[in-house]
Amino acid sequence: MAQYKGAASEAGRAMHLMKKREKQREQMEQMKQRIAEENIMKSNIDKKFSAHYDAVEAELKSSTVGLVTLNDMKAKQEALVKEREKQLAKKEQSKELQLKLEKLREKERKKEAKRKISSLSFTLEEEEEGVEEEEEMAMYEEELEREEITTKKKKLGKNPDVDTSFLPDRDREEEENRLREELRQEWEAKQEKIKSEEIEITFSYWDGSGHRRTVKMKKGNTMQQFLQKALEILRKDFSELRSAGVEQLMYIKEDLIIPHHHSFYDFIVTKARGKSGPLFNFDVHDDVRLLSDATVEKDESHAGKVVLRSWYEKNKHIFPASRWEPYDPEKKWDKYTIR
């Protein structure tokens, strides 16, 4: 008796179609997953590119001040892009080195674990391999450290065309301080040399009439030291000075009463002026009052007067003592008045 096989045939066909659809569904899922992964990769690339572009754009804005030409702008942009690409490449290289180093460390950890577990001895070949791996690891560590130092030294954002002299710089400040100290020491040595130079002082002991004497002093000596030496010279000729002390004497130069604490150096360096002549010259010329050209300043001066204070108090209302006044360094005498 013949059997009807149509139902079995249809069932087999249906099974085949179901398997085919299942396979297509799996392929579709794989395709969707691949597309999603590609989109993620593309998004990461876009983000990197965007960050890269934003960093370059920000640096370009900060380094460009004022009006610049289009060519200059393009040149700066290209330079910044190249510099940024170098930094990114170094960063990637550093990451690769870090990964290699981690792999080597992991491998070393596994080997160490095997050594602890296994009681078998290692062959010479394995020991040599371990030494080579340690050397390779040390090489990677050294290279990674060098990369980090280079990256720190060469940071993006420093434009060599920008003037940074106003910014604090420790090395520059130390160099400036060193030069300043050298100049100060050189100046002080020069001033000490000037102070040690000898000058001849012409002075006149004044008791109503003049009695000229000369004495050699150093430019660094004070008026008190000068008066002490002048007193030693004058005592043998003037009896009223034999019992006098330095504090009882006054020194009058160009109609100004000079305080005892001032030195000749003070007047020489500042080229100080008095009422009737310069205070920085202490020799005397016979033609001090004969000026051939009134427009040319003469450096000729009068002999300074050494006076007893008691004589001045008695005669300060009489010429020439009536013209004398205390020296004031703030007061300027631009024109001399000789009478």
UniProtKB/Swiss-Prot annotation:
<dbReference type="GO" id="GO:0005654">
    <property type="term" value="C:nucleoplasm"/>
</dbReference>
<feature type="region of interest" description="Disordered">
    <location>
        <begin position="150"/>
        <end position="177"/>
    </location>
</feature>
<protein>
    <recommendedName>
        <fullName>Protein FAM50A</fullName>
    </recommendedName>
</protein>
<dbReference type="GO" id="GO:0008380">
    <property type="term" value="P:RNA splicing"/>
</dbReference>
<keyword id="KW-0507">mRNA processing</keyword>
<feature type="compositionally biased region" description="Basic and acidic residues">
    <location>
        <begin position="168"/>
        <end position="177"/>
    </location>
</feature>
<dbReference type="InterPro" id="IPR007005">
    <property type="entry name" value="XAP5"/>
</dbReference>
<keyword id="KW-0539">Nucleus</keyword>
<feature type="region of interest" description="Disordered">
    <location>
        <begin position="1"/>
        <end position="31"/>
    </location>
</feature>
<feature type="short sequence motif" description="Nuclear localization signal">
    <location>
        <begin position="152"/>
        <end position="155"/>
    </location>
</feature>
<feature type="cross-link" description="Glycyl lysine isopeptide (Lys-Gly) (interchain with G-Cter in SUMO2)">
    <location>
        <position position="100"/>
    </location>
</feature>
<keyword id="KW-0832">Ubl conjugation</keyword>
<keyword id="KW-0007">Acetylation</keyword>
<dbReference type="GO" id="GO:0006397">
    <property type="term" value="P:mRNA processing"/>
</dbReference>
<comment type="function">
    <text>Probably involved in the regulation of pre-mRNA splicing.</text>
</comment>
<keyword id="KW-0508">mRNA splicing</keyword>
<comment type="subunit">
    <text>Interacts with EFTUD2, a component of the spliceosome U5 complex. Interacts with DDX41, a component of the spliceosome C complex.</text>
</comment>
<feature type="modified residue" description="N-acetylalanine">
    <location>
        <position position="2"/>
    </location>
</feature>
<dbReference type="Pfam" id="PF04921">
    <property type="entry name" value="XAP5"/>
</dbReference>
<keyword id="KW-1017">Isopeptide bond</keyword>
<comment type="similarity">
    <text>Belongs to the FAM50 family.</text>
</comment>
<dbReference type="InterPro" id="IPR048337">
    <property type="entry name" value="FAM50A/XAP5_C"/>
</dbReference>
<dbReference type="GO" id="GO:0043484">
    <property type="term" value="P:regulation of RNA splicing"/>
</dbReference>
